[in-house]
């Protein structure tokens, strides 16, 4: 190497930031000066408030420099963290520089690492609120062009590193005519913080990147190609705004149309001249037209529009490309279709192969962290900051405008790891399950190894269920309704009727409830009796709100309606609870519409009593009777003499513990799916059993005895008048006393007196103050000859 290149002890400095180029080239003593190292040290000592910035005097003639870095972290690290971070920092940057030097400069990888790690100086900032330093690798030399070419490599390192010091490398210093503040000097006269020397290096030349003193331990490398030739294969960086948006901005600047606009792409836009159709004067300089075309270049994260030929004949225009990274991250996450807005204004997210919804947890933040490693490196590092994650989350919420309809797959049962098709038994996981958007699931993982018919658990479970609901001819209808009701709890659709589990104490009702809860877990909810006895849509009602999208709702332990003061079951509530949407809001919330997919089961020891009975109510009630009693040995004899029980079985004291430990979870789930295919494919069916409710007996029978009178009955009036009917206002009517006489032939007044009176009070009309009548005709009076 030439001796001139091997040494430089003249340090060229600028006396302030922003020295004009002319003053720099002319070496105006007001703005620039050159020092020997000892002279520079004396100058700083004599002028403690001076501002000096080291730079190359003439980069064209001499551009040998030491490898240097400027690190500026907006946080103060304690001593232990700092020592750990600086050690990792040296290893990371030396490896990075060595790889670049080997690839682009033909340097020996091990020699670069050895020279960098063996000798370097480190300054320390006096600013206690931040961690800032300059590091000079004293025996590692290169050219300024090489450092500029290395800028992209160091930028990628800083973006991908977990080390806070590496992430804080200022790559902007790697440019033409770069400057670096001299140790011991201020940034500006009003700034009292400086960089100070640290042992073992106490000579100022050890802190100057333009000082060159090569020796046997030094290592030098430089680019094998020109800097201009080091153009990346793809110019467009992920951090830029989209190429389409950038070119549209360029087009708007010209106003005149670009004829070859469609020929431009991310790889050729810097080499293809722009062909302008000058319908109007040039928008940049107002000239009528130009002889030479305009062209684009990519510099400093911006598109530069310039004219070829004489560049001074038209203005240069800069189009910045810095996109909002946090906005771009939000857009990329939205593009994965992993966050959706529901009709209720809630957000559901796709994490770990399942849709998750919980308004009390920051699920979008969890999604951002889980998807971080799938994003480009320059984005993933941004998400390590909690503040930036919150910004991304806010961007995602703001960008979600259109809501989607969820939970529209009634024959699909969601799990934490996928979706089970109830019809064909297929289990979908991963992207195959993603299309089945849902806000609720069972909350546990499906295990196909346990979802089998032949297992010890299944054998035990079948015996338990056969004890609760025996497979006998007498109990056949009851057992069928039992299976239909429980299997309907898998279906995510509105059910047409409510089911009462009716029986004395210790007959298996609670055991059935616990088995069902174990099998569908989070799709099951237990609620209070108020949904049956209180007004539903009056004030906050968390019981109703908790029913939203649940597939099974259990209401346990109704009161003894024979007791005075006990509220009866409201028939209006029964009707509302079989509607697709139930009104009721949680406390401190405005969400009142709850989608009703639940099979509502009421287990009770007492006969249900309703405030009002009509046909609409009777179409909505089914009853499953439980007549097997599970008794302890001491009470078995008494139970066997109780007419309320068909059978008496010994109580299994350990059964509850097994159910709570989910021993029968997958066995019972298998049975439910089997029953579902038996009864509810292709259509989910639940039929009422009003004949099982004693209070419905009168209304069921009277519907077969009476019809409402109408105009078509008037021609029959000759015969009807002989049977006590009269014509009033052109309508065939039956006087009240006559009706009471006729109805007594069918109903015992002692047993059904209250029902008869209620029917009369509801339907009677007044001819005058004393005469009352009903607009009904007994069917036998119009069917008999």
From Swiss-Prot:
EC number: 3.6.4.-
Region (Primase): 342-469
Binding, ATP: 503-510
Pfam families recorded: D5_N, Pox_D5
SF3 helicase domain sequence ranges: 477-639
Compartment(s) where it occurs, according to its Swiss-Prot or TrEMBL record: Host cytoplasm
MF terms (GO), sorted A to Z: ATP binding; helicase activity; hydrolase activity
Chief localization: host cell
Keywords noted in UniProt: ATP-binding, Helicase, Host cytoplasm, Hydrolase, Nucleotide-binding
GO cellular component: host cell cytoplasm
Residues annotated as catalytic: 170
Taxonomy, superkingdom: Viruses
InterPro entries in alphabetical order: DNA_primase/NTPase_C (IPR004968), Helicase_SF3_DNA-vir (IPR014015), Phage/plasmid_primase_P4_C (IPR014818), Viral_Helicase-Primase_Cplx (IPR051620)
Coiled coil: none
Enzyme class: hydrolase
Subunit structure: Homomultimer; hexamer. Interacts with OPG148.
General function of this protein: Multifunctional protein required for genome uncoating and replication. Major viral uncoating protein that is required for the release of the viral genome from incoming viral cores containing the viral DNA genome. Possesses an ATPase activity that is required for hexamerization and uncoating.
Entry-linked PANTHER family: ATP BINDING PROTEIN-RELATED (PTHR35372), SF3 HELICASE DOMAIN-CONTAINING PROTEIN (PTHR35372:SF2)
Protein family (similarity comment): Belongs to the orthopoxvirus OPG117 family.
Name of the protein in its database record: Uncoating factor OPG117
Organism: Variola virus (isolate Human/India/Ind3/1967) (VARV)
């Amino acid at each position: 190497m030439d001796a001139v290149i091997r040494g430089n002890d003249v340090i060229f400095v600028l006396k302030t930031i922003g020295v004009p180029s002319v003053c720099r080239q002319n070496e105006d003593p007001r703005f620039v000066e050159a020092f020997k190292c000892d002279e520079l040290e004396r100058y700083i000592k004599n002028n403690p408030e001076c501002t000096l910035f080291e730079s190359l005097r003439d980069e064209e003639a001499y551009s040998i420099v030491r490898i240097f870095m400027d690190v500026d972290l907006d946080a103060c690290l304690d001593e232990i963290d700092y020592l750990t971070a600086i050690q990792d920092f040296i290893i990371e940057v030396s490896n990075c520089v060595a790889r670049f030097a080997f690839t682009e400069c033909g340097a020996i990888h091990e020699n670069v690492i050895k020279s960098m790690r063996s000798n370097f100086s480190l300054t320390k900032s006096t600013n206690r609120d931040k961690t800032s330093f300059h590091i000079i690798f004293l025996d590692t030399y290169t050219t300024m062009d090489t450092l500029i070419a290395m800028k992209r490599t160091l930028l990628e390192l800083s973006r991908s590193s977990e080390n806070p010091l590496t992430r804080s490398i200022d790559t902007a210093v790697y440019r033409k005519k770069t400057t670096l503040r001299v140790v011991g000097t201020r940034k500006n006269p009003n700034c009292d913080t400086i960089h100070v020397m640290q042992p073992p290096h106490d000579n100022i030349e050890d802190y100057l990147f333009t000082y060159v003193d090569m020796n046997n331990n030094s290592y030098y490398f430089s680019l094998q190609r020109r800097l201009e030739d080091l153009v990346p294969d793809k110019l467009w960086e992920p951090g830029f705004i989209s190429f389409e948006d950038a070119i549209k901005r360029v087009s708007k600047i010209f106003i005149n149309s670009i004829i070859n606009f469609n020929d431009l792409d991310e790889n050729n836009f810097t080499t293809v001249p722009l062909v302008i159709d000058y319908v109007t004067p040039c928008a940049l300089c107002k000239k009528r037209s130009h002889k030479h075309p305009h062209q684009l270049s990519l510099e400093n994260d911006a598109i530069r529009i310039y004219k070829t030929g004489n560049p001074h004949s038209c203005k240069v225009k800069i189009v910045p490309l810095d996109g909002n990274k946090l906005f771009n991250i939000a857009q990329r996450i939205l593009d994965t279709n992993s966050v959706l807005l529901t009709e209720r204004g809630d957000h559901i997210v796709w994490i770990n192969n399942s849709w998750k919804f919980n308004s009390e947890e920051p699920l979008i933040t969890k999604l951002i962290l889980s998807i971080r490693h799938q994003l480009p490196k320059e984005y993933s590092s941004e998400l390590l900051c909690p503040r930036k994650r919150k910004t991304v989350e806010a961007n995602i919420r703001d960008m979600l405008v259109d809501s989607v309809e969820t939970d529209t797959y009634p024959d699909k049962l969601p799990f934490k790891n996928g979706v089970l098709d109830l019809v064909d038994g297929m289990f979908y996981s991963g992207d195959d399950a993603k299309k089945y958007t849902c806000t609720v699931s069972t909350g546990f993982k499906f295990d196909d190894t346990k979802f089998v018919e032949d297992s010890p658990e299944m054998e035990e479970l079948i015996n338990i269920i056969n004890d609760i609901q025996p497979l006998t001819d007498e109990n056949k209808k009851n057992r069928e309704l039992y299976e239909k009701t429980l299997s309907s709890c898998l279906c995510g659709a509105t059910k047409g009727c409510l089911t009462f589990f009716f029986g004395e104490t210790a007959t298996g009702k609670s055991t059935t409830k616990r088995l069902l809860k174990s099998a569908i877990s989070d799709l099951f909810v237990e609620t209070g009796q108020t949904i049956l006895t209180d007004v539903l849509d009056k004030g906050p009602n968390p019981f109703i709100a908790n029913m939203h999208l649940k597939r099974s709702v259990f209401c346990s332990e109704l009161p003894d309606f024979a007791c005075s003061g006990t509220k009866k079951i409201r028939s209006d509530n029964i009707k509302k609870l079989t509607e697709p949407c139930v009104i009721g809001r949680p406390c401190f919330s405005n969400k009142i519409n709850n989608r009703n997919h639940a099979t509502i089961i009421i287990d009770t020891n007492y006969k249900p009593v309703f405030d009002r009975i009509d046909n609409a109510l009777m179409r909505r009630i089914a009853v499953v009777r439980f007549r097997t009693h599970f008794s302890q040995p001491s009470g078995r004899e008494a139970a066997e003499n109780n007419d309320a029980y068909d059978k008496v079985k010994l109580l299994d004291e350990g059964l509850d513990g097994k159910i709570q430990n989910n021993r029968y979870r997958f066995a019972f789930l298998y049975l439910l799916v089997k029953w579902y295919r038996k009864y509810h494919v292709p259509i989910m069916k639940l039929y009422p059993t009003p004949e099982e409710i004693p209070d419905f007996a009168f209304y069921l029978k009277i519907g077969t005895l009476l019809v409402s009178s109408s105009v078509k009955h008037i021609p029959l009036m000759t015969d009807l008048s002989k049977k006590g009917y009269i014509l009033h206002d052109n309508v065939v009517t039956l006087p009240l006393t006559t009706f009471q006489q006729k109805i007594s032939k069918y109903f015992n007044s002692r047993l059904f007196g209250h029902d008869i009176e209620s029917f009369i009070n509801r339907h009677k009309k007044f001819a005058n103050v004393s005469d009352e009548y009903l607009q009904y005709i007994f069917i036998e009076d119009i069917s008999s000859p």
